[in-house]
Regions:
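Conserved catalytic core of the tyrosine transesterase superfamily
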Residues: 1-306
Length: 306
């Protein structure tokens, strides 16, 4: 344990609680993080505090390493453990900058290697099947088709898709404005088929769902509220079963499909990074399976001794 962070179990628990509150307030007020990010930070730090409450005092590097091992043993994936460690790094980085601690116990800890397997994505035939699944004679079917088309056409996160406002999509210029992680705005081009699906929903579906009510959101429920991530997730899984795609169809699979098909079509990694809203291109490099395949095809096609 570090020198100034000793004390009784109760004192340590209270101190950690106060530090956590200060960090979350900083993330909410000064960094302007989204509700989703705040909820993730809160959940990660609550789990960390629950583990730490069993220790005597506040944790140092050795204790945090034990905690990381504990997460592995509980069955979390490399990606999830990596996210927990990222949360702790942000937390202790804040405490260090504020002068609340003298050393950062996470400084020499390394995140696990992520994405050891290729992200799951659909092929073009599967994409067509899933997009044809909604019943376009119903307002909900028009909405669901428009949401899936827009998600596949833009690579939005599901939280971004659900929060698209009426003024965020320019149908004439075929461009969408969205606010991603860290309150960062980006403009994403949208293809003609997605635009047409949204127009059909606006013309024949949305008013039937609202029934005279007003909403600033583009995609609404039968009760006139904003479509939630959980509701869309459930709808998409249902369409997956209808289309014969049973295993693990989530909104993120459509996002992965968007990125994969762009790269297969010749887009560069930097452009895909911008459209996905990744702050660091290393995140986008999970799609290097496509780049490797394309390079291999290029060599086989053009090298005289391939």
């Amino acid at each position: 344990m570090s020198g100034t962070m000793s004390g009784t179990l109760a004192e340590a628990s209270q101190q950690l609680r106060g530090q956590t509150t200060a960090f979350l307030n900083f993330c909410r007020i000064e960094k302007g993080l989204s509700l989703n990010s705040l909820e993730a930070y809160t959940a990660d730090l609550s789990r960390f505090k629950e583990f730490n409450d069993k220790l005597e005092g506040l944790p140092g590097t050795a204790e945090i390493r034990i905690y990381i091992d504990h997460l592995y043993q509980s069955g979390l994936s490399n990606r999830s453990v990596g996210r927990h460690l990222t949360t702790l790094r942000s937390f202790y980085g804040f405490l260090l900058r504020e002068g609340l601690i003298q050393t950062d116990p996470t400084e020499h800890l390394h995140a696990p290697k992520q994405w050891q397997t290729i992200p799951k994505y659909l092929n073009l035939e599967e994409i067509n099947r899933i997009l044809q699944a909604p019943d376009l004679t119903r307002p909900t079917g028009l909405r669901d088709r428009a949401m899936m088309e827009l998600l596949y056409a833009s690579g939005l996160r599901v939280s971004e898709l659900c929060k698209v406002g009426m003024g965020d999509l320019d149908l004439s210029f075929q461009v969408l404005r969205t606010t991603g992680k860290g309150n960062k705005q980006r403009l994403v081009p949208v293809g003609t088929e997605a635009i047409q699906a949204v127009e059909a929903y606006l013309q024949s579906g949305r008013a039937g769902l609202l029934k005279g009510r007003a909403s600033r959101f583009l995609f609404v429920t039968a009760r006139g509220g904003c479509m939630t991530r959980q509701a869309f997730w459930k709808l998409l899984a249902g369409y997956g079963r209808k289309a014969g795609i049973f295993q693990g169809l989530t909104p993120h699979v459509l996002r992965h499909s968007f990125a994969t098909h762009l790269l297969e079509g010749g887009a560069d990694l930097r452009s895909v990074q911008i459209m996905l809203g990744h702050a660091d291109i290393s995140t986008t490099q999970i799609y290097t399976h496509v780049m490797r395949s394309r390079l291999r095809d290029t060599v086989e096609k053009h090298h005289p001794r391939a």
